């Protein structure tokens, strides 16, 4: 049974494709009652899924972040949401089905997973182009088509056939085993493609033609945002064989398309390889023991262990395969923002204090699998921007209203009893690096 909504003019004009006598009766109702019946039907279908739905979500009108699959289980008032790229992640929040010139699904109470791309911060006042209101375009038992009210991006709810935790486990495995590049033939066209795993995009070249395609990871492989037609053949959905590194198209009419994935070279630090325990070496003879934990949703790493009060965020650079560490807000102290700032520290003197995240440090692997080390270097070596250390500061307004920086000396925030990480040298990995 399928119920399709096609918006022809504004307000309440739409057509309904029906497959039962009960649905035929809808045409005999006033427009407001027809819409109410449609919303009621949508609610019934949403709640009917035993395991919930995989929500194929694309933030940003430019598709700058590719897509992300959330898992969503609906009851009468709330939705239990998980992210397929974050293990054991679930949050429950309220949702609504409303009328705004047609049926709209709204997640209108805060959910840190689902609202990640739509929540602004000090560096992104417009957030990441995400949204939480979705116009329902069509409804079938196993597939609901929506589009973002703001971006107009097409999105899908697909009925899950297994528990969300199992779906996430398989999807994370696909992410961690994904390839550096692809090559092969689609239809009559030879193609090569370079993958960006954390931005979920592939730059495909075929002869003189170039295609930038965006995708979501699934529990089987990847699904492109829209079908790619090349060499007379359309492809969209692929399964990944992690042993042979092959991507096989599962779309009807394209089952003979198999692309060869090229794994990362052994001398390249792909995103998943950074996860480990490390000893941070700095100062004259100082060591702090930390753990790098992946955040696959962001394509970043979380450095844990410096203090119970904060963690640091490191960005993965897909082009260089390095990590970038910049100045960043890490919390509040007595109502004032606290920064892990980057500075230049020489002979007891501090200069070049920076509080904006510009990836001031590059962490580059030394190339040794048996004694792996990530060396700190200044990303910008110019003297005016040179940094070599980290410093805990907080910003406050003095008696005259001037914005002033103070050194944070509260013991709970300190590492090895100090607010200064002078002359950062390296992160020395615990254990060897597997191929």
Which residues are covered by each model-predicted region?
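Extracytoplasmic/periplasmic C-terminal soluble domains
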Residues: 158, 165-214
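Beta-sheet ligand-binding and adhesion/scaffold domains
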Residues: 23-24, 110-177, 187-189, 220-272, ...
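Acidic/polar, low-complexity intrinsically disordered N-terminal segments immediately downstream
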Residues: 19-108, 139, 151-153, 161-184, ...
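Short solvent-exposed strand/turn elements
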Residues: 103-121, 289-294
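N-terminal glycine/threonine-rich, aromatic-flanked beta-hairpin/loop signature
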Residues: 60-102, 190-224, 288-341
